[in-house]
Amino acid sequence: MKLLAGRAERRYRISNNSNPKSTAEDDMIRSVLWQLLVLGISGVLASTAQAAGDPAAGKSKFATCAGCHAIPGYTNAYPTYHVPRLGGQHADYIIVALKAYQAGERKHPTMHANAFSLNEQDMQDIAAYLSSFPAAAAPYPVRGDTAAGKTKSAACAACHGADGNGIIPIYPRLAGQQEDYLRKALGDYQSGARTNPIMGGMAKPLSPQDITDLASYFASQPKGLVTVQQE
C-alpha cells in the first residue's frame, strides 16, 4: 500500500506541475491518496488494539457513568449539548477515548475525573459492556439536510464508513450519534479544542453549514448507536 501511494503521489506531482491549475481530477487524486494513507495507518493501529474485557464486570463499573450516559436526552451543562450515545460503540475506540480523558488530552473536567482512577482492565471491561449493546432499531429524527450531508460525507468514509458504521475499531461509529454532539465535536476539531491531526485537517476547511449537514447525515443513519439502558 505504501508503494502504491508513493507511485500515485509521484504521478500526481508530475501531472500537477505541468498544469498549475487544480482540477476536479486533481482533487479526486488527493482524496484517494489521503484515504490510502489513512487506511494504511489504520490497519497497523487496529492490529495492535484489541479490546478483550468482561461485559458483566463492565456493567458494574459503568455505574458511575450511568448518571449521564444512561439517561435519554441528558445534556452537558455548559456548553449545552447532548452527551454522546455509547451503546454499540467500538470497544477499542472507547478505550482510546478513556485514555485520552485520563491523560488530559481530551478536555472535559467530569470525564477526566471519572477516567483518572481507571486501570487498563477497568477500561477493557467498560468498553466490552458498551460495545455489547445492539444497534438502534430505527433511525433517529434529525433537523438538518441529510442529502447534502451524504454528499459531503465521502471524505469521512475511509475511517468511519459510508453510513457511519465503520469497521476500523479505533475510530468511532458515528451512525445514530447525537446530532448536536457531532456538531460540537467537529467544531472542536476545527478550533483545535480537540487535538487529532487527521480530524483537525479534515475539519479545518468545513463551513458551519458543512458541519450541520454532516452531523445530520451521520446522526440519521440506521443501525446506529443507542443510549445505554441499565436494568
Name each model feature, range by range.
Residues 3, 27-32:
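Positively charged n-region of N-terminal signal peptides that target proteins for export
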Residues 10-27:
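Short, Lys/Arg-enriched N-terminal segments with co-localized hydrophobic residues
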Residues 35-44:
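Bacterial N-terminal signal peptides
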Residues 47-51:
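Sec/Tat signal peptide C-region and signal peptidase I cleavage site
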Residues 52-75, 141-165, 177-178, 231:
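Sequence/structural segment immediately N-terminal to covalent heme-attachment motifs in c-type
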Residues 55, 59, 72-102, 112-117, ...:
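Gly/Gly-Pro-rich "capping" loops immediately C-terminal to redox-active cysteine motifs
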Residues 74, 78, 130-140, 175:
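His/Cys-centered metal/cofactor-coordination and adjacent catalytic loops
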Residues 116-138, 189, 204-231:
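C-terminal capping alpha-helices of c-type cytochrome domains
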